[in-house]
Amino acid sequence: GIGTPDNRWWWDVLENGPGARYAAAFDIDWTPLKRELEDKVLLPILGEQYGTVLENQEIRLQYEEGGFLVSYYRQRLPLAPTSWAAILSFRLTELIELLGSGHAAILELQSILTALSHLPPRRERDPEKVAERYRETGIVRRRLAALITDCREVHAHVLANVETYNGTKGLSASFDKLDALLNEQSYRLASWRVASEEINYRRFFDVNELAAIRTEEECVFTESHRLIFRILTQGIATGLRIDHVDGLYDPEHYLQQLQAWAAAELPREREGDAPSLFVLVEKILGEGEQLPRSWPVAGTTGYDFLNLVNGLFVRADQEQAMEALYTRFIGERRPYRDLVYQSKKLIMRASMSSELNVLGHQLNRLSERDRHYRDFTLNSLTHAVREIIACFPVYRSYLTTDREAPLDRDQAYIVLAVARAKRRNPTLNGQIFDFVRDLLLGKLDPSTGLTKEDQIRFVTKFQQTTGPVMAKGVEDTAFYVYNRLISLNEVGGDPAHFGSSVEAFHQAIRERRAGWPYSMSATSTHDTKRGEDVRARINVLPELRERWSKAIARWARLNRRYRTEVEERPAPDRNDEYLFYQTLVGAWPLMTMDEVRYEEFVTRIERYMIKAVREAKTHTSWINPHPDYEAALCRFIRAILSCRVGNHF
């Protein structure tokens, strides 16, 4: 994480900007679309607008151990050494009058100010200049710390200046100095709401506190794996589980790097061509998708097996009947594929619009280089790439620089996504979609002026965007909206695929034994939405369809009085109510509960339902909670699960 000074790499980048030693470790766009962010990192950590937070004295300047920093509650951020000069020189004339111009402390302070003015700028990336900046900064820190320790007048001078910089609440102008100081930094503080549109560093999905690192760089790979390699060398662990492998620049190359290290450092007997290190990857496979055979791994973390087994316990022949029941109860038909498409677009609009803006501007710059494409507008290019990602059938493609042509698998996914996007957008010029398709596949005429590097730069960004959009759009949105049979809404699963036959299961297991015999056979993980027991209960509902139909009809009649109007609509809506009833069927305890345990159970159901409706993003969300809808939902749950006399539920 990057939320504390413990991450010395990130701290270094915030202090030293693009010229930091560790700047290359992070995927930061130092020349983003917004000019005010040039050579800066956007830090969307504030709870309110920047100006409001500043004038509420929530951002505080501090002196600490020979340097200065700012704090925002528990967050601590470094200040660039060159910016310390403004703090130290403020009211310097008064200090000189107090001590005299020839005083040793004054001469030392002036010498420190001179040293700060000669520090190489943060934009400087020449290795010798960078080394000089770090060396001289260290010397200045020690000198300043010693001066403040030895001279109480200088100490008082610094503390008084810090107090002045921190402003006076109610006097807006008193914060001008702190504002100017913050504007000099290699970061820009902003409200958390700004992140979705303007963040300029790659993250783990849309989690601002988890900055992505560039493991494709050899030095970053080696440094970031130092602890992991020590654990493996000591025999504390004998294998690795690679989380979110699709977020990597080039998953196959990364896995090869791991195995190359293991082959050199962990000599051991191997069976045939088996890799040196046992590695499982968290790879969510789409319908018909296979784990790439070229990856040096033992298999996946088992989501594919989990859903294969779960499907055995769902009556496939009851799909149409359960679909009709669901449609009738909620009062509308919800085709799953359309819902996924809309959910992915919602994520791109609400959580990841900055990534889409970057892709759109990349396309625009590339199209401007050729007269055949220059008339494609920025808006239409951004629209096209958004639609292609929304229609992308799997998490990502694996186009790389070391292949002359894309693999058939990747080409098929891209062609399919573009074809679907065209069908959904008949009013958008089809040539724009063709341009994006040919750029992704490396089929543009070299005479256009587009280089291989141009193509790879765009493809890389595209491939590292499709995965997070799929994950957030499907697992964290559509799975909470499409409630036909919620036991099928599992990580790596496809709720539109209603059950599996025994024959299909055995065929899949035979293929698994032949291709990936050591792949994990998981039935639940830390990421699953529900435990095996909850899924098993809900899986039975298609077998009890008539009883289930009568039960929910009866419950809906009984509980209709507990629904309330929120913005002229009943709350909770019928879809959330259907989810609630299935959740109770799956989670209702088998043992008798005393009053305390029952209250704990009701509270857990209540919290789960709040989480579910926020993930669904239909009436409320994590970004913009709707207190009235959530309160109505909680009242509904509490009323239904009340132990009062006369509650027939």
Describe the function of each predicted region.
Residues 240-243, 279, 393, 526, ...:
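Conserved, mostly hydrophobic/aromatic
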